[in-house]
Amino acid sequence: MTNADPHELQKFSDLAHKWWDPNAEFKPLHDLNPIRLNWIDAHAHLPGKRVVDIGCGGGILSESMASLGAQVKGIDLATEALGVADLHSLESGVSVDYEAIAAEALAAREPGAYDVVTCMEMLEHVPSPANIVAACATLVKPGGWVFFSTLNRNLKSYLLAVIGAEYIAQMLPKGTHDYARFIRPSELAHFVRAAGLQLVEIKGITYHPLAKRFALSNDTDVNYLVACRRSV
């Protein structure tokens, strides 16, 4: 059975035409993108690397990594979003190979094929995040990097990421997140180690409402990033 929630796929497919509008529903992803891109590149040195972006959606991060000189494959099961990603790639002239395939299926087909694996803002939308982490570990080459970003599960994250972002500030559509699927850093660290990866860094992302911008921080209470490596 596919490790995907049909409701989640439909939710993102319905918004597919808005992926590349920096002032619409995906504005937070556009605002987050430079921060996560620079953080990934600082660790993995993207130019010339073979990268797979799992849960790539409309291709915001995929295209950015390709623009830095990486050879990027983007995968997702939301086919409408992939269609938008393909079209934008043609318009921008930035080459990305997109495919509608599950992470587990790609891992079975191409084990150890990638220097870098990214899985950003995706784990909190699937029934079994541990299986996605395991697929990422299978896809990456020995010595390669795996990057995750997700949301912590606590009262603060519920108030800020759900009530604040979806209902008060309306930065995100209502129902974007299911709080029960948020993942504590300790839980993700367990998934990472169980998959045979070495945890290198956990970094928080903080939103500054007055400046209306995101920044890296040591506060992992809400949004956080995880960098891992597969041992040689």
UniProtKB/Swiss-Prot annotation:
It catalyses: a 3-demethylubiquinol + S-adenosyl-L-methionine = a ubiquinol + S-adenosyl-L-homocysteine + H(+); a 3-(all-trans-polyprenyl)benzene-1,2-diol + S-adenosyl-L-methionine = a 2-methoxy-6-(all-trans-polyprenyl)phenol + S-adenosyl-L-homocysteine + H(+). Belongs to the methyltransferase superfamily. UbiG/COQ3 family. The keyword Methyltransferase applies. InterPro entries: SAM-dependent_MTases_sf, UbiG_MeTrfase. The lineage of its organism: Bacteria, Pseudomonadati, Pseudomonadota, Betaproteobacteria, Burkholderiales. GO terms for biological process: methylation. It comes from Burkholderia thailandensis (strain ATCC 700388 / DSM 13276 / CCUG 48851 / CIP 106301 / E264). This is Ubiquinone biosynthesis O-methyltransferase. The gene is ubiG. Pathway: Cofactor biosynthesis; ubiquinone biosynthesis. Gene3D superfamilies: Vaccinia Virus protein VP39 (3.40.50.150). S-adenosyl-L-methionine binds at residues 36, 55, 76, 120. Keywords: Methyltransferase, S-adenosyl-L-methionine, Transferase, Ubiquinone biosynthesis. O-methyltransferase that catalyzes the 2 O-methylation steps in the ubiquinone biosynthetic pathway. One of its GO terms (molecular function) is polyprenyldihydroxybenzoate methyltransferase activity. The keyword Zinc does not apply. Its EC number is 2.1.1.222, 2.1.1.64. Pfam families: Methyltransf_23.
